[in-house]
Swiss-Prot record:
Basic and acidic residues bias spans: 72-85, 150-162
Catalyzed reactions per annotation: L-lysyl(20)-[histone H4] + S-adenosyl-L-methionine = N(6)-methyl-L-lysyl(20)-[histone H4] + S-adenosyl-L-homocysteine + H(+); L-lysyl-[protein] + S-adenosyl-L-methionine = N(6)-methyl-L-lysyl-[protein] + S-adenosyl-L-homocysteine + H(+)
Keywords annotated in UniProt: Acetylation, Cell cycle, Cell division, Chromatin regulator, Chromosome, Coiled coil, Methyltransferase, Mitosis, Nucleus, Phosphoprotein, Repressor, S-adenosyl-L-methionine, Transcription, Transcription regulation, Transferase, Ubl conjugation
Disulfide bonds: none
Family, per entry: Belongs to the class V-like SAM-binding methyltransferase superfamily. Histone-lysine methyltransferase family. PR/SET subfamily.
Protein name per its UniProtKB record: N-lysine methyltransferase KMT5A
Species, as recorded: Homo sapiens
Enzyme class: transferase
Any single Gene Ontology cellular-component annotation: chromatin
Amino acid sequence: MGEGGAAAALVAAAAAAAAAAAAVVAGQRRRRLGRRARCHGPGRAAGGKMSKPCAVEAAAAAVAATAPGPEMVERRGPGRPRTDGENVFTGQSKIYSYMSPNKCSGMRFPLQEENSVTHHEVKCQGKPLAGIYRKREEKRNAGNAVRSAMKSEEQKIKDARKGPLVPFPNQKSEAAEPPKTPPSSCDSTNAAIAKQALKKPIKGKQAPRKKAQGKTQQNRKLTDFYPVRRSSRKSKAELQSEERKRIDELIESGKEEGMKIDLIDGKGRGVIATKQFSRGDFVVEYHGDLIEITDAKKREALYAQDPSTGCYMYYFQYLSKTYCVDATRETNRLGRLINHSKCGNCQTKLHDIDGVPHLILIASRDIAAGEELLYDYGDRSKASIEAHPWLKH
């Protein structure tokens, strides 16, 4: 027989022993009560108690009554359990412990403690599972609250960017207010978590705005607060452009102002300034026929045949090519009459108009009114000096 059969036999033996002991105790109690009634009277029998030795003797008698006889032991052999569920080994100590009136007030089965212990263990195992489920539920509720709070904050930011919507006076709100429900403990915790989430700044939305504000503050200039005042003074390039346009007009129109023809001792005719010229000012154009060098040589040979004809030919180079201005023919232009001097107050300069070179005279220094206008012819050849000795000076 297995362990299950042995346990069942032990339980059955204990139950039978308990019943026999109860019967023996009841019989002894009746006999003792009758004896005391005879010895001490009825009052003592009614309120008397059984002594401890008597109870122990009764239990021992009950166990002895349930113990198998020698014939049964010899037939089964030592340690062999009965077929009717009883067992004779190591069962007496447990029976005594459970039947002792000092240790427990009532009778109970020996397996009750083991059952109760396993029951308590099952309860203890269930407590952590409940706590884990509760924590998971709280985390899920907290995450939902944070997400809802972030969505509401983003919606507020979008509405603020779009601008407030002004309702019409006759328009009624279509959405009705939802019914108010009493707040629960879970809602209160979710509300607290949502408030904490709202206190934290939203990095994805507010960071670019702060950066943009910093950029606009850095880009602030003085002109954002005060109007721009343009200077009335002209730049150097503007002045040069205006002077060039004025010279073009004077050359094309042929105007010659601020000078006159006068007779100079030892020289003949000369040009005198009638106004003051500053350094760099345009004075007059050396006007004549613009010809190339080949034509100039032919004319010069022709002019040499008549000694009364003066020399009014001026050679120069322009764009790597030699040209000549022939002012020999008599005209009313004053530039051809300005005399020579190595230390003159004017100098020649090329001025082109639409790609055509013009020879002009500008003031090399400040010229006062009444002063003769002079410039260096630049001819230092021996033949020229022999023909015109005044070129030395």
